[in-house]
């Protein structure tokens, strides 16, 4: 660290140079994040020095978080849901499994969770951090969780089931109603990871059931900083009842609130304010329009890829396209040389593209033109 500080102009010259080397979103088809809505940025800036970790000092900010959870809960068919704004899907998924452990009062050294093979890697982190085993159930032919395969992995030490609404690789939605019945039959905690799909599915023409409308669902991960167009980091963890969240309470006597339930201690209120602002600004109609545009662009991309002989692995369910290719990994590298960034799936291996709001029709036209040159 310097003895004497630099001037603002010199500092920002360095920062801007570094920022200029980042890939602009207009060249990115691999990410589930996008440019935040301008009102989200404005709200974030207004609350940048707030701390939800000490809500008695920031009661207004805490109220905004409470209202934000209410709006998201309403979207998920439970306006009375409780929860908090997290850093994102990973934290929310870890916390949900912490809740499941506390609810079961079991020996975590023997405990296990059953997840589909398509579950996010954050559950592997949770397994390591919490000291519980993770059992991965094979998928069906449409790359969804197979309830019968999940049932076969349940034993007396199983504490929770996980289902996904918008899988990271293929954008598939698990049969959550069936998994919900399975959870109830075995008296198990069911967590739904809707980090991506949570702000897509409710605004589709024929939305699949995935949320608190299903009796067995106890908690849901949903990320405003993905298709919710909030600033990063803005994740969400919602519970069916306050009693579920209360099992996470930790004494924090030196704070004005005395207890905490979140994983992070210090939490920026800017995340909650950003999410709340964009939810209020767009409303259901605004989100429906955004999702409709993304799905139309998904259709356009899927058709153009098929015209090049790249058939989809599955018909797109959400705004994610996966396409067969002779050498997906090699193709990804060739596209990166042209400053296009896509990803590849693992099982089966395919080219993967996420059609976020920044992936416009013009972006798709430019992308497919370059793809034709390297295919």
Curated annotation (Swiss-Prot):
Q: What UniProt keywords are attached to this protein's entry?
A: Decarboxylase, Lyase, Pyridoxal phosphate
Which cofactors is this protein said to need?
A: pyridoxal 5'-phosphate
Q: What GO terms in the biological process aspect are recorded for it?
A: carboxylic acid metabolic process; coenzyme A biosynthetic process; methanofuran biosynthetic process
Q: In which pathway does it act?
A: Cofactor biosynthesis; methanofuran biosynthesis; Cofactor biosynthesis; coenzyme A biosynthesis
Q: What is its EC number?
A: 4.1.1.11, 4.1.1.25
* Keyword hit for Protein biosynthesis: no
Q: Which reaction(s) are listed as its catalytic activity?
A: L-tyrosine + H(+) = tyramine + CO2; L-aspartate + H(+) = beta-alanine + CO2
Q: Which GO terms describe its molecular function?
A: aspartate 1-decarboxylase activity; pyridoxal phosphate binding; tyrosine decarboxylase activity
Q: Which residues carry this modification: N6-(pyridoxal phosphate)lysine?
A: 226
Record InterPro entries: GrpII_AminoAcid_Decarb, MfnA, PyrdxlP-dep_de-COase, PyrdxlP-dep_Trfase, PyrdxlP-dep_Trfase_major, PyrdxlP-dep_Trfase_small
Instruction: Determine if Lyase is one of this entry's keywords.
Output: yes
Enzyme kind, highest EC tier: lyase
* PANTHER family named among the record's database cross-references: PTHR42735, SPHINGOSINE-1-PHOSPHATE LYASE 1
Tell me the protein family, please: Belongs to the group II decarboxylase family. MfnA subfamily.
Primary role: Catalyzes the decarboxylation of L-tyrosine to produce tyramine for methanofuran biosynthesis. Can also catalyze the decarboxylation of L-aspartate to produce beta-alanine for coenzyme A (CoA) biosynthesis.
Please state what the protein is called: Probable L-tyrosine/L-aspartate decarboxylase
């Amino acid at each position: 660290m310097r003895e004497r500080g630099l001037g603002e102009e010199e500092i920002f010259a360095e920062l801007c140079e570094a920022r200029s080397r980042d890939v602009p979103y207009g060249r990115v088809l691999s990410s589930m994040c996008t440019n935040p809505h301008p009102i989200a940025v404005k709200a974030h800036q207004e609350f940048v020095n707030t701390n939800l970790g000490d809500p008695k000092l920031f009661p207004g900010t805490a109220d905004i978080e409470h209202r934000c959870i209410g709006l998201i809960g309403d979207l998920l068919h439970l306006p009375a849901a409780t929860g908090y704004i997290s850093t994102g899907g990973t934290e929310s998924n870890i916390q949900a499994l912490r809740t499941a452990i506390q609810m079961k009062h079991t020996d975590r050294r023997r405990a296990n969770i059953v997840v589909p093979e398509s579950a996010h890697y954050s559950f592997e982190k949770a397994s390591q951090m919490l000291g519980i085993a993770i059992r991965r159930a094979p998928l069906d032919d449409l790359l969804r969780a197979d309830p019968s395969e999940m049932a076969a992995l349940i034993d007396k030490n199983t504490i929770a089931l996980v289902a996904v609404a918008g899988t990271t690789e293929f954008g598939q939605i698990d049969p959550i109603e069936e998994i919900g019945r399975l959870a109830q039959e075995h008296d198990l905690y069911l967590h739904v990871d809707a980090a991506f799909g949570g702000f897509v599915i409710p605004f589709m023409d024929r939305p699949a059931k995935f949320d608190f409308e299903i009796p067995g669902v106890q908690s849901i991960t949903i990320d405003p900083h993905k298709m919710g167009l909030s600033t990063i980091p803005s994740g969400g963890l919602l519970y069916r009842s306050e009693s579920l969240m209360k099992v996470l309470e930790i004494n924090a006597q030196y704070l004005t609130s005395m207890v905490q339930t979140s994983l992070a201690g210090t939490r920026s209120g800017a995340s909650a304010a950003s999410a709340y602002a964009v939810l209020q600004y767009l409303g259901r109609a605004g989100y429906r329009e955004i999702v409709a545009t993304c799905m139309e662009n998904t259709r356009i991309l899927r058709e153009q890829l098929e015209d090049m002989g790249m058939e989809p692995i599955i018909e797109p369910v959400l705004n994610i396209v996966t396409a067969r290719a002779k050498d997906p990994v090699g193709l990804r590298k060739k596209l990166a040389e042209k400053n296009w960034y896509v990803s590849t799936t693992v099982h089966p291996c395919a080219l993967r593209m996420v059609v976020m709001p920044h992936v416009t029709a013009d972006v798709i036209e430019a992308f497919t033109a370059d793809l034709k040159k390297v295919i």
